[in-house]
Amino acid sequence: MNQANNVLDSIYQPDLEIMNQPEIELDDLLIEEDEDLLLADDGDIDEFLEPQTDEDDAKSGKAAKSRRRTQSKKKHYTEDSIRLYLQEIGRIRLLRADEEIELARKIADLLELERVRERLSEKLERDPRDSEWAEAVQLPLPAFRYRLHIGRRAKDKMVQSNLRLVVSIAKKYMNRGLSFQDLIQEGSLGLIRAAEKFDHEKGYKFSTYATWWIRQAITRAIADQSRTIRLPVHLYETISRIKKTTKLLSQEMGRKPTEEEIATRMEMTIEKLRFIAKSAQLPISLETPIGKEEDSRLGDFIESDGETPEDQVSKNLLREDLEKVLDSLSPRERDVLRLRYGLDDGRMKTLEEIGQIFNVTRERIRQIEAKALRKLRHPNRNSVLKEYIR
């Protein structure tokens, strides 16, 4: 995983077996049903809305009254918008397994068309016209446009039918710096990406696959947008050293080290250690209750040093996408990057070592590497990998 991330860093510098199912009428599947709707329970909607608070009665004057009216209107507008949205998505029928598979097939067909378009755009050095695109996939223009239309409708249907999953996941991340409305918006972007990446032939349900993408989008947005106090870089480095030292001492002593022991190993005073811990809001106990109901523990939200199932999914997805991008390079360019970044054996080789393998000079290997990285920075290629950049 580290080797793959090294490639990403270089690119972005400066700049279940599936059962046979009968075919489904897509026109029936891709329309909004008017009957047999699943209605949302209005009684559950209020739990997603932030509680209203009374204005301080001590405030007086026109300015305070005007401010209260503006805030009240804005709050009611937001709550009404969320309420309406939840009611609307509650009316969307959930997909059956066979419908999910059929939609996934149509989306895969759409993505194949879009890959052809990307290659054509790179070749022409401009956006291709529909007629050129249709010719590239060997279809008459009307048939091509219908196929494209069906694929896009299938993607929209897959996303719309799983919006309740976004709400369910977003609810778990409330009161962490982003409004519920923003959490839904970020989660929906993750859902769209999941629909674009889903491979139904691998045998898992779309909801299982989409959950990872939704969580990733939400947690990344929280990390990027919700921190109001940003610490200096050097302080982050010290915090990281404290964590590593604490872990090392725990392994050496077979118990949790004291503040004095950590400070001694770090060669700093206890006062400084406590100050840094307070600045970073490091928890004294991972059992500290979190949230209004105090039904969660701080430890639930601390990243583990071990590889979680989500980490494994991310690792596999990155490997697959990186392989696809590397396949677009020439064999020599691909081999040079594999050796340079240790993608096969985990060992990064020097320019001299690679030059000896190919019987060329160090400078020639540097040129090949630079050319390969320039190609990977092309928008048609780096768009595939950009989602992994934090």
Swiss-Prot record:
One of its GO terms (molecular function) is sigma factor activity. The keyword Transcription regulation applies. The keyword Nucleotidyltransferase does not apply. Keywords: Cytoplasm, DNA-binding, Sigma factor, Transcription, Transcription regulation. SUPFAM superfamilies: Sigma2 domain of RNA polymerase sigma factors (SSF88946), Sigma3 and sigma4 domains of RNA polymerase sigma factors (SSF88659). One of its GO terms (biological process) is DNA-templated transcription initiation. InterPro entries: RNA_pol_sigma-70_dom, RNA_pol_sigma70, RNA_pol_sigma70_r1_2, RNA_pol_sigma70_r2, RNA_pol_sigma70_r3, RNA_pol_sigma70_r4, RNA_pol_sigma_r2, RNA_pol_sigma_r3/r4-like. Disulfide bonds: none annotated. Residues 48-75 are annotated as: Disordered. Interacts transiently with the RNA polymerase catalytic core. This is RNA polymerase sigma factor SigA. It comes from Nostoc sp. (strain PCC 7120 / SAG 25.82 / UTEX 2576). The gene is sigA.
